[in-house]
Amino acid sequence: VTATDETTPTIADVDRLVAWMDAEGLGTGAPLEHGYISGGSQNEIYELRRGDLHCAMRIPPPTAPAERDAGIVREWRIIEALTGTDVPHTEAIAVCTDPAVLGRTFYLMGFVDGWSPMGMERGIWPAPFDTDLEARQGLAYQLVEGIALLSKVDWKAKGLEDLGRPDGFHERQVDRWTAFFERIKGRELPGFDEASAWLRAHKPLDYIPGIMHGDYQFANVMFKDGAPARLAAIVDWEMGTVGDPKLDLGWVVHTWPEDTSGGEGSVGGYVDMTGMPSRAEVLEHYSKQSGRQVDDIDYYCVLAKWKLAIVLEQGYQRAGADPKLQGFGPVVLDLMAAAGELAESSDYKG
């Protein structure tokens, strides 16, 4: 058993977990080694080793709302659906919906051998991507290739017809998120009205429903060690659904710096974007890999900025003394202003 301190979350009942694993034929009879990896208010992740089995367990903490159990099942259905596809993903091993085992629904997925951009110290890429800018470019191309491959998965054949409501997806976006914003509203957000009106008046050129991640970015993928850059897995499917996969592309590029040659403009949030491909090159790569046009990317970028601003505003409105959530305040204002500005300046006519 991995040593933990009093503040580190622990598995509710290891004996019951072992008994369940025995019943599932997962490392039967061997001792279980387990350790906490990471977590938050919605999910905890533990590393498990038992015999030849090496996996990760994803489970809501005891304090998470009851609906997270259904969310865990949704995540499980998506990673299970990716089995046999060319989308880099974690192996789907087993799911448990019986609260008698650990009190919450959980699933086991293959342990990913690689690294996460979220684990980088001070936003510095691991070797060789810290100094080899040509190799670093591959990280960006692999990032968008992941969602290009995801967009081509036959979600109906994979049994995901009831996962989302793809019909009318774009028609619902503005109404749904405007209503959400009205419920949490604590201040005016300049740019909101302009972006909302523009989104109501425009649509994508060709909406083709598919599996979408919902929060696609460097923070939610893992790469294999060493060069060349190779995507190991897309992770954290909390927002996954069947909708418009091209919104994932908008999520990636709406903050992509125009200039990646270096300096302040090349810092894309938590990672150093110096030496990365240009926004146009990233879009071209997605288009080539997915077979989709990207002429309507302004629509997706306005929607991404507008929607992300509303999501983060909820965190800011309930921040209290939490410095991380307080920090969302100015970020939200910048995002919504940028959404309004892009809506007013874009020449997209769709």
Predicted regions and their residues:
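Juxta-kinase regulatory segment immediately upstream of eukaryotic protein kinase catalytic domains
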Residues: 2-27
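ATP/Mg2+ or Mg2+-diphosphate-binding catalytic cores
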Residues: 2-8, 183, 266-277, 281-293, ...
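ATP-binding pocket architecture of kinase catalytic cores
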Residues: 33-194, 201-211, 226-229
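All-alpha amphipathic helical-bundle segments outside canonical DNA-binding/catalytic cores
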Residues: 164-165, 292-304
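Catalytic-loop of the protein kinase fold
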Residues: 211-213, 218
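Activation of the activation-loop gatekeeper triad in protein kinase-fold domains
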Residues: 235-240
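C-lobe/activation-segment region of protein kinase-like
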Residues: 248-259, 263
